[in-house]
From Swiss-Prot:
Spans traversing the lipid bilayer: 90-110
Organism phylogeny: Bacteria, Bacillati, Bacillota, Bacilli, Bacillales
Keyword Membrane among UniProt keywords: yes
Family named by the database record: To B.subtilis YqfD.
Record-level GO cellular component terms: membrane
Pfam families: YqfD
Gene: spoIV
Membrane topology of the entry: Single-pass membrane protein
Protein name: Putative stage IV sporulation protein
Protein's organism: Priestia megaterium (strain DSM 319 / IMG 1521) (Bacillus megaterium)
Biological process, per Gene Ontology: sporulation resulting in formation of a cellular spore
Amino acid sequence: MKNGWTNFVIGTVRIRIVGKGIERFLNNCVRQQIMISNVHKVDGQLATATILLKDVKKIRILIRNADCKIYFIRGRGFPFLTKRVIKNSGFALGFLSFFIILGLLSNMVWKVEISGAEPQTEHQMTKQLAKIGVKRGEFQFLLESPEKIQRYLTDNMNNITWVGVEVRGTSYHFQVVEKNEPKPQQKTPYQHLIAKKKAIITNLFVEKGQPLVKVNDFVNEGEVLVSGIIGNEKNKKVVAAKGKVYGETWYKSEVEVPLKTDFQVLTGNGYTKHYLDFQAFKMPLWAFNKEKYTSKVTEKVEHPLYFFKWKLPLSYEKVAVREEQNSQRVYSKQEAVEKALEIGRKKLLSTLGEDAKIKGEKVLHQEQDNGKVRLSIHYQVIENIANTQPIIQGD
């Protein structure tokens, strides 16, 4: 039995041989190709030896016709170790389950703390956090990273300027900086309406005040459109002029559109892999063999694991893999011109008031160079040009 590792896997049994025919019994074992080792003869009627577990049945048959008896002392090797483990499995499983439960509890969210926010903002933030799973009782390794949580809150809450996210063990701490809305300045009760830019008047809707212009009049920036001083010289009254004065204004825009554009698009195919990281070693948990994509986008989210408040050298990592492919958008010259006009209109309207509209547009210049179409566009816009100007006493 020179191969100790093989013997450990098969299993060995230490036996005691008692009787007069010990030597004859041992010789019979050799003839039956039963491997015997570590034979120790105490006296003429007592000896000990080691046999393989698989030869126990053969030994039982041989001992029937022998002038001696055998006693099994102990067994060693993997089969006996397995048997002992199974015998004590209840305790082992209970012990293991205890630590697994402690580990899971140590990686759950038990507290969400928000500081620096008014009660109304805090309530709103708590609801937003619950939508993405950041609440008491959730597993931390199933949540988004602090950076993504921070981005989500700033994108979905208009009343905060900044929010800091910090994970301390089983607690999530949020430090909020709210927007300081400027207090509305107390406006003077008396005011004129003046033109905020050059225009040709197209319409007037005056609620209070004395109109000083009429339709088709050309006005310059700063010119009074509706006076807050009404009445005649004998019966003069000062009011807060109120209303809307629409005028035709003019804008110029430069827009360029490439005829060919290369970009990457997601195909919709993808998968998610999960790993348990131990320093430099990464063990896959599931999603082992997945399709390899020629071009892909990979997003990794790593969550450190804790045992109570202590950070373990273990971390859970989720890797989302999405397939992407190259795509090319090609415009004809006419299509590029139409796209440029569309972009120009959208860009202009985004800078104007809600009730502004484009009356007309004209391409002043058009050229194609280096795979791009460039347009110089003139716009005619109808918009409210009225702005307020306080009336100072003594005017």
